[in-house]
């Protein structure tokens, strides 16, 4: 359970932003989306390799 302490006089918008940040860090939504459909392990590995190559290319261009 995510708990966000709200200080006296603190803006609700700020507290909501903290909650959203903590919620995203837990990865619940990402996990739920990934579990909606089964992917074969071979497909998962292939996608992971493709992402790694893409990120590596971006880093090379950045340097």
UniProtKB/Swiss-Prot annotation:
A Pfam cross-reference name: Ribosomal_S21
InterPro entries with a match to the protein in the record: Ribosomal_bS21 (IPR001911), Ribosomal_bS21_sf (IPR038380)
Molecular-function GO terms, alphabetical: structural constituent of ribosome
Presence of keyword ATP-binding: no
One GO-annotated biological process of the protein: translation
Keyword annotations from UniProtKB, A to Z: Ribonucleoprotein, Ribosomal protein
Superkingdom, natural source: Bacteria
An annotated GO cellular component: ribosome
Family, per entry: Belongs to the bacterial ribosomal protein bS21 family.
Name under which the protein is recorded: Small ribosomal subunit protein bS21
Organism: Bacteroides fragilis (strain ATCC 25285 / DSM 2151 / CCUG 4856 / JCM 11019 / LMG 10263 / NCTC 9343 / Onslow / VPI 2553 / EN-2)
């Amino acid at each position: 359970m995510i708990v966000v302490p709200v200080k006296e006089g603190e803006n609700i918008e700020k507290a909501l932003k903290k909650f959203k940040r903590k919620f995203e860090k837990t990865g619940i939504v990402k996990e739920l989306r990934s579990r909606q459909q089964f992917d074969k392990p071979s497909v998962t590995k292939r996608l992971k390799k493709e992402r790694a190559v893409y990120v590596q290319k971006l880093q090379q261009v950045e340097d």
